[in-house]
Regions:
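Conserved glycine-rich Rossmann-like NAD(P)H-binding loop of the short-chain dehydrogenase/reductase
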Residues: 38-52
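Residue(s) in the substrate-gating loop at a strand-loop-helix junction
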Residues: 149
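Active-site helix of classical SDR
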Residues: 129, 165, 173
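Conserved glycine-rich cofactor-binding loop
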Residues: 15, 22-24
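Substrate-binding pocket helix/loop in short-chain dehydrogenase/reductase
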Residues: 105-106, 113-118, 213
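C-terminal substrate-recognition "lid" of short-chain dehydrogenase/reductases
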Residues: 126, 141, 185, 221-250, ...
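Alpha-helical segment proximal to the catalytic Tyr-Lys
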Residues: 134, 178-182, 241
Length: 257
């Protein structure tokens, strides 16, 4: 890598926290940031859940650590962030990837499912942003990347809580960007399109729906977890120092059609 590319995109000496890092998109982002030079803190629902991610990072000689945290539990998030700061000294990059989804017609959608999705996808994201943001303000710099969705822009079908939460994530991203931009903290989001992950397994098993969705994607294919790596590195690096409050679509062109 040239000196210019290293200066612009290299993450050596940075501590990157990635939630929902046990598999899928979160694991792909964790590996990408690690290969770019960051120390990676992989967070899952339990320490055991991120063991496979830690193993992959270790094989790539990436300095890393794994933590368990209930994304819906405010006190647990606060404790986790404090422990990370105590053990690693700083947080340079936060990627809020952890999330959940519940499917049901709106008129049958339960309060329990609604609250679970909002707590994990929106409340938990805010708490991580707030607690990591405190440290970044002390440091005088930082990068926050929230994982939004195509449903930050459209309503979807039978996923009212998920759509509401991801719309909220997009607006939260902009609100925090407005507040922290002059403190050298960049807050942005990535909105993935249709990716081959556990969350989309059932959709992909419905051949008719799978073909309908695929035909609408200009690239003609679904994304793979490592397709988010470049976007994550860009938004984590010096190269994006004048990018703030942006929701970056990584969707194969879906929203352009």
């Amino acid at each position: 890598m040239s000196d210019y590319l290293s200066r612009q995109f290299g993450l050596h000496g940075k501590v990157a926290v990635v939630t929902g890092a046990s598999r899928g998109l979160g694991q792909g982002i964790a590996l990408a940031l690690g290969e770019a030079g960051a120390t990676v803190i992989a967070i899952g629902s339990s320490t055991k859940s991120v063991e496979s991610t830690i193993e992959l990072l270790v094989k790539k000689d990436v300095e890393c650590a794994g933590y368990g945290c209930d994304q819906s539990n405010t006190a647990e998030i606060i404790d986790t962030v404090n422990t990370i700061i105590e053990n690693h000294g700083r947080i340079d990059i936060l990627v809020n990837n952890a999330g959940t989804i519940k499917r049901s017609p709106a008129h049958e959608f339960s309060d329990e499912d609604w609250n679970e999705v909002i707590n994990v996808n929106l409340n938990g994201v805010f708490t991580f942003c707030r607690e990591a943001g405190k440290q970044m303000l002390k440091q005088g710099n930082g990068k926050i990347i929230n994982i939004a969705s195509l449903l930050s822009f459209s309503g979807g079908i039978t996923v009212p809580a998920y759509a509401a939460s991801k719309g909220g994530v997009a607006q939260l991203t902009k609100a925090l960007a407005n507040e922290w931009a002059n403190q050298n903290i960049q807050v942005n989001a990535i909105a993935p399109g249709y990716f081959e992950t556990d969350n989309t397994y059932n959709i992909r098993q419905d051949q008719s729906r799978f073909e309908s969705i695929t035909s609408r994607i200009p690239t003609g294919k679904w994304g793979q977890p490592d397709d988010l790596g470049g976007a994550a590195i860009f938004l984590s690096s010096r190269a994006s120092s004048y990018v703030n409050g942006h929701v970056l679509l990584v969707d194969g062109g879906w929203m352009a059609r």
